[in-house]
Structure formats: C-alpha cells, structure tokens
Design a protein with these regions (language model features):
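Structural signature of tandem-repeat unit edges
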Residues: 1-6, 15-28, 37-50, 60-72, ...
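Consensus positions within tandem repeat domains that build extended binding/scaffold surfaces
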Residues: 8-11, 30-33, 52-57, 75-78, ...
Length: 224
C-alpha cells in the first residue's frame, strides 16, 4: 500500500509471489526480500534508493527490471537471477550502483547516455559478450566488468569493448576477461588510464595517435 517506505529482509523470500506493485513511497528493500519467488518482472519506483543483497536474487522466472535513477546502494541485488535479460533505466540516471547486476544472467546491456559512472563490480560475473561504453562515461569502477575464473567456466564472457576517450578513471574494470580480444578506442585519446586492460586477454592494440601517457598497470597481466 501507499505509505510503505521499507520492505524488510526476507519479507517474501521463498514464496509463490508472481507479481508485485511497489508503492511510490518505498525507499528501501531489505536483503533477500523477494529472493526465490516467482516474479517475472519488477518495476522499482523512483523513490527507491537502497536494495539489500539478493533482494531479487535466485529468481529463475525474473526476466525484466526497471531501475530507478536515484538508486545508490544495491550491491548484489539480483545475484543468482540467471534469466534476467531486459534492463530499463529510468531517464536521467547518472550512476549504475556498485554491484548492481553482479552475478546475474544479463547478456547484453544498453548504458544510457546520461550515465557518467559505472560502479564497483556493477556487472561482475555476468554474461555480457559485447560492450559499448557511451561518451558520457568518465569513470569505470574497480572490477566493474570483471570475471572470476572460479565463478563458472561455462558462461559466455566479454570478447569486444568499445571505449570513449573521455574515460579518466578506471581500476582493472575488465580483470579476468581472458576472451577479450577486440578493443575499439573512440575519439581523441590522450591518456590510457591506469589498470584499464590489466588481467585481460587482449593480444594486440594500436595506441591512438595523440596519446601522451599510459597509466600505471594499464596492461599488467594481460596477454600482450
């Protein structure tokens, strides 16, 4: 009902819930609140700023979600929901929260042109194979698109990325992506940020004309 501001931890966990309409007053959803339910889609209202760990985790039926623009804390919110495919972001979103889609089943993502920052581990251990980072993005968080060897060797992994020259701050965003071979560097690059391609499978890269600086550990542990 309208007026509810918080849904507690494990409130509906393991139930047969297939559909839920969340009130516009809701600001916080607790850990495991809807985990292992039968939800097919979820629209998070603009008011939601905090989602606990695995609040929507391990939901085999969940395929679509709408993310509000003010969501700031949501680490591991969809972890284990392996059939999550369709992501819609509310207009005006500027940051994709830390760990938001970590360990979920998404295989493709369209990042809105309003986004300037992608958070720590936001897409770690997902199934994304090709990635286009829009020109608006200046910061990629640590391990934002990384992949862990002990997570699952059977999952598809990143093979191609297209990056804007506006990137200023990165920290091993693609670490562990050993199948990453194709990199497109768009725009007028002056600096290759620190750690950008560390721990990747990149074997060949043409450094653009105009680059005057390569940051520390930019290619550390890669296949170059």
């Amino acid at each position: 009902p309208e007026g509810v501001t918080e849904i507690g931890s494990s409130a509906f966990s393991g139930s047969s819930l297939k559909e839920v309409v969340l009130p516009s007053t809701l600001t916080q959803i607790g850990s495991y609140a809807f985990s292992e339910t039968q939800l097919r889609e979820i629209t998070l209202p603009t008011s939601v700023t905090t989602i606990g760990s695995r609040a929507f985790g391990s939901i085999d039926s969940l395929s679509s979600v709408v993310i509000p623009k003010n969501l700031s804390n949501a680490y591991g919110a969809f972890e284990g929901s392996q059939h999550l495919k369709t992501i819609h972001f509310e207009e005006g979103i500027t940051k994709i929260a830390d760990g938001l889609f970590k360990g979920s089943g998404i295989s493709s993502i369209t990042i809105p042109k309003t986004v300037t920052e992608i958070g720590y581990e936001a897409f770690r251990n997902t199934r994304i194979t090709e990635l286009y980072i829009p020109d608006s993005v200046t910061k990629l968080g640590d391990n934002s698109f990384s992949f862990s060897d002990n997570y699952s060797n059977d999952l598809p992994s990143l093979t191609k990325v297209s990056l804007p020259s506006e990137l200023q701050s990165t920290s091993s965003p693609f670490y562990g992506q050993k199948n990453l071979k194709e990199v497109v560097l768009r725009g007028n690059w002056k600096t290759i940020p620190s750690g950008l391609f560390s721990g990747t499978g990149i074997e060949k890269l043409v450094i653009p004309e105009g680059v005057t600086e390569i940051g520390s550990s930019a290619f550390s542990g890669s296949s170059l």
